[in-house]
């Protein structure tokens, strides 16, 4: 006959780094432990009483993140580990650890870019790239729907320095495709999106080149891919911009513009669409575009890549925008 008795476990505060490290490795994430000062627990002991299969709930209260933590770009989690108080009885391994991930809902000011105030970058150097990633959040208020309608609305352009070949050119529409179909040009070829986009809608867009493969992600999901020749992509220090002055008829809101000198994986893209650690490996330039005023945009990576509107024309700023569109 099985004995009916109470079983007690402690919610441990030790060895939590390894718990979170295992979670990060399994999910291609980079969460850090939330500082203990940022949350409280109603109890550190869980007891399953005789004749029952669950303990009383333990309440975790999470305090609002400090401004410093919000601006750090880091993502936080609470890791918990159960350890039996009875030396003769263990805790089932499959249920002994719990990880609560905390993803910020990002509200920020965003600039409105159009044909009158393109953004031009002054980078710290020229680039010779085999791998790269460009990503940003975008909301465009005017898109054509017919073939050739409102074509060539540039949303990102980068070209080689004088005398060198190179291009990363991203636009909505082209003469033979619909105005609400996305297109990227690089290495002398081009790729169109499978998706047709809606105006006045927030999207996270990411374009990843491994050298011989090009990927397009929309909201972290693969939309299209193609093989490439593996050419070097040269980019000039003063040859990167947002928008164009002739074909761009829309107002375009931007946030979280990032330029990487490495190919990001699908999981890395999907898990970091709205927040990223500015010191991430390979993050060459990072414009949050959340200043809320003015005509210049700070490079949060610390690499000193400057960005400002042409002619110092101050864009319209929209305050307190939820950039995931939800």
Regions found by a protein language model. Name each.
Residues 136, 198-209, 214-216:
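Short tryptophan-centered beta-strand motifs in secreted/extracellular beta-sheet-rich domains
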Residues 183-204:
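Short, aromatic/His-centered strand-loop micro-motif at the edge of beta-sheets
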Residues 106-179:
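Extracellular glycan-recognition modules
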Residues 131-142, 248-272, 284-294:
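Extracellular, beta-strand-rich glycan-interacting domains
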Residues 66-77:
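Short glycine/proline/serine/threonine-rich loop/turn segments at secondary-structure transition edges
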Residues 226-253, 278-282:
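Flexible glycan-contacting loops in extracellular carbohydrate-active proteins
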Residues 96-112, 274-326:
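Extracytoplasmic low-complexity segments
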Residues 1-11:
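Single conserved hydrophobic/aromatic residue that forms the stacking wall/gate
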